[in-house]
Each structure stands twice: as structure tokens, then as C-alpha cells.
Amino acid sequence: MNFYDFSAVKMNGETVSMSDYKGKVVIVVNTASKCGFTPQFEGLEKLYETYKDQGLEILGFPCNQFANQDAGENTEINEFCQLNYGVTFTMFQKIKVNGKEAHPLYQFLKKEAKGALSGTIKWNFTKFLIDRDGQVIERFAPKTEPEEMEEEIKKLL
């Protein structure tokens, strides 16, 4: 299995295969609208705007598993991200990232990202960096600001 074997549902209800992102550098991030890390949407959007023409994609996955910080409906979440942070990168429908009902993509990401943080998602805005071949290169903690990932991203572009 690799990253390209999975699919997810975008905010508009369209099912998208991760294979659509072959040849791209991808950041996968679990998001929340009412979290102390929510302002990271700005940094993620800045990275996307700066590097999208060089092959960067950012995939946002709202999740309500951490202190009920994304309790809204998908349409509310999408509007919030666009209106408050100008998000233009792809946002998917709300998922679970931990437990028996965790989305298969997140089950894969947690298994592939080695190190002390592997096995579970601890909080919102955990970020996974995936290379152009679909390999999980690095996992970044929620406190890691998007701009701190820039050098790693540039190496992969």
C-alpha cells in the first residue's frame, strides 16, 4: 500500500483518489476551526500560494476528535476556512483520525511515519509531508508552524 491507494471525499461531495496527486509534493493535515493552532491555516495557505505552481498540494481534513473543536457541518467548516483564512487548497469532508473509525488514509499515515509520534494523532494540525512518489517523508507536530516546513518542502520540489 502507498499514499496513492486511498481516496477521500472533498467538501463538494466528490470522491478523489490520492493517485490524482501523483508527481506532486503533498502536505496532509488534520484541521479544526476552533483550535489554538487554527491560525496555521494562514501559513498553510501561504505555502500553497508560493509553491503550488512547482507541484505542492495541501489536503486539509477537518476532524472533531480533539476537544470538540470542529463540531460544525462540512459546509460551515468550508465557509469558515475560506472567509477567515482565504483557504484555496483542497479541503475534504470531516473524518476521524484515531480509533476504529479512523479514515484508512490516516491509518496508513500513522503507520508509515516512523518515530516517537507514530501510532496516533495527538492533536489538530498534525502535518504529514509526502514526496512525488507517494512516500511519507516526515511527520510534523501540531506546534510546528507551516513556514518551519518550507526547507523540507523545497528539497522535494
From Swiss-Prot:
Gene Ontology BP term (one): cellular response to oxidative stress
Keyword Oxidoreductase in the entry? The reply is yes
Q: What SUPFAM superfamilies is this protein classified in?
A: Thioredoxin-like
> What reaction does this catalyse?
2 glutathione + H2O2 = glutathione disulfide + 2 H2O
One GO molecular function term of this record is: glutathione peroxidase activity
Q: What class of enzyme is it?
A: oxidoreductase
The record ties this protein, via Gene3D superfamilies, to:
Glutaredoxin
Membership in a protein family: Belongs to the glutathione peroxidase family.
Please report the name of this protein according to its UniProt entry: Glutathione peroxidase
